[in-house]
């Protein structure tokens, strides 16, 4: 919907990596070298020790939460989680504590695509002892013979590293009095383990869409420059990922991806699949900040390459793990952990708005963000729509006044408000007739039901006009210039509010 990949050069090797860094305890400390070009970057410990690294469950957390949750009597209190005071990032995404009083992701499934998990982590069980991990969880492996799928919770186990477990916990760790709380603590987890090969990841996307996921988060990717790339078998990554991502999007399943840890040292690099059309790319905020970007986060290096859409906390993260006998750890950083935050917000959104489309979620997400100011040589227009805000996201109005303008060579044109899922329209068919060259379409839109405005030609053969569309909703102006290249295609623009 917003990103275009440019594929111009062949790169002989493809390496997908986990988009995070970690701080382990001193006795595990290793040196971290910059990965060689086109080689995978392992999750290696950072040289900097931190106070959160030796969490054996005996440390009393400091309550850093300024907001009283006041949950309903029939709900468990997230403030009773032993380590919620170390989840500082919860204070920098809007008032999540109040949101939990009503919405916790109940009935929503979050698919997490990664390199493996500990599906039996104690925070993946509810207080009554039932697991929040879907029995449809699966693993995907690609060889020269093709990609195979193995279904079952036991198939997703990877105890050699904690990246996937940490990401899943950020999104949806349960409220059970054990440790931490996820953004959507009552959401179901569909855990999808891959061997980090592109075709395995692509198959995981489609599997998620076909097996109950309402949102997909992925925190693995591959860095490349704007010259483009090809995978080893000669097919480009755009081809590998475009179709399965669109498969999700067309079924109203948003795909959310870590935007990359390029930072200012790699300003011209982006990541697959985060740069693919219809993927929401997430950049990272600095520790304990609502306004400063994390120094390691990728950002949009120029106006024509807008791959990072929103920002969420990504630094000094505390969450679920499994190594050295530990179940929780702190000091982790990376856009890997910003992506599941946004996925958790999506779960809350769809619990409130179960009939809304992926277009509506994306538009509501962007319009609810808080703009980020220019900083450290990075301009505000390089920082996407800004920092996510759960309060605004869940309290946007469900209707708004829309005015759209167009210029074209059409002798006649009709405009109508449309629901892309049900195929229904708000105003009577064929819609409102617009005059040539300066058509104006104004209507009050119930955006809880309708997600698009359609401009279509009638009573004459198909043409290929250039349309200049501006959509005004609740005082916001959106420049939506788009030439039509396919004959007979309707021009569709998402409804913002």
Indicate where each model-derived feature is located.
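Hydrolase catalytic cores
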Residues: 168-171, 190-195, 214-215, 314-383, ...
């Amino acid at each position: 919907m917003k990103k275009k990949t440019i594929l111009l050069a062949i790169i002989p090797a493809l390496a997908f990596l986990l988009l995070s860094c970690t701080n382990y305890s001193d006795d595990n400390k290793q040196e971290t070298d910059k990965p060689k070009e086109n080689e995978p970057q392992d999750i290696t410990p950072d040289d900097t020790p931190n106070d959160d690294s030796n969490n054996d469950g005996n440390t009393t957390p400091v309550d850093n939460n300024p907001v009283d949750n006041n949950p309903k009597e029939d709900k468990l209190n997230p403030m009773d989680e032993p380590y919620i005071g170390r989840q500082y990032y919860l204070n920098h995404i809007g008032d999540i504590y109040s949101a939990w009083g009503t919405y916790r992701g109940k009935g929503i499934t979050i698919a997490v695509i990664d390199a493996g998990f500990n599906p039996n982590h104690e925070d993946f069980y509810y207080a009554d002892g039932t697991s929040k991990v879907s029995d449809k969880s699966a693993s995907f492996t690609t060889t020269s013979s093709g990609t195979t799928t193995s279904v079952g919770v036991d198939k997703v186990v990877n105890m050699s590293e904690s990246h996937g477990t940490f990401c899943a916990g950020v999104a949806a760790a349960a409220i059970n009095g054990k440790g931490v709380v996820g953004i959507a603590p009552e959401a179901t987890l569909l855990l999808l383990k891959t061997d980090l090969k592109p075709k395995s990841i692509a198959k995981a996307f489609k599997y998620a869409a076909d097996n109950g996921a309402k949102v997909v988060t992925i925190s693995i990717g591959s860095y490349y420059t704007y010259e483009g790339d090809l995978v080893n078998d000669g097919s480009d990554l755009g081809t590998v990922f475009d179709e399965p991502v669109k498969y999700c999007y067309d079924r109203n399943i948003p795909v959310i991806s870590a935007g990359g840890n390029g930072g200012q040292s790699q300003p011209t690099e982006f990541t697959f699949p985060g740069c693919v059309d219809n993927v929401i790319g997430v950049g990272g905020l600095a520790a304990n900040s609502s306004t400063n970007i994390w120094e390691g986060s990728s950002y949009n290096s120029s106006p024509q390459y807008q791959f990072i859409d929103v920002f969420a906390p990504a630094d000094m993260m505390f969450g679920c793990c499994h190594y050295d006998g530990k179940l929780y750890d702190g000091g982790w950083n990376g856009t890997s952990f910003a992506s599941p935050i946004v996925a958790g917000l999506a779960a809350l959104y769809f619990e409130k708005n179960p009939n809304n489309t992926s277009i509506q979620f994306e538009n509501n997400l962007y319009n609810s963000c808080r703009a980020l100011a220019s900083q450290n040589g990075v301009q505000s227009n390089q920082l996407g729509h800004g920092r996510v805000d759960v309060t605004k996201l869940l309290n946007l109005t469900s209707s708004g006044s829309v005015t759209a303008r167009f210029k074209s060579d059409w002798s006649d044109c009709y405009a109508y408000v449309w629901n892309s899922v049900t195929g229904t329209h708000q105003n009577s068919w064929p819609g409102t007739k617009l005059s040539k060259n300066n058509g104006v379409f104004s209507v009050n839109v119930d955006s809880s039901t309708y997600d698009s405005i359609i401009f279509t030609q009638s009573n004459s053969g198909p043409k290929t006009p250039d349309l200049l569309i501006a959509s005004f909703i609740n005082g916001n102006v959106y420049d939506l210039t788009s030439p039509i290249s396919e004959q007979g295609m309707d021009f569709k623009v998402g409804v913002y509010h």
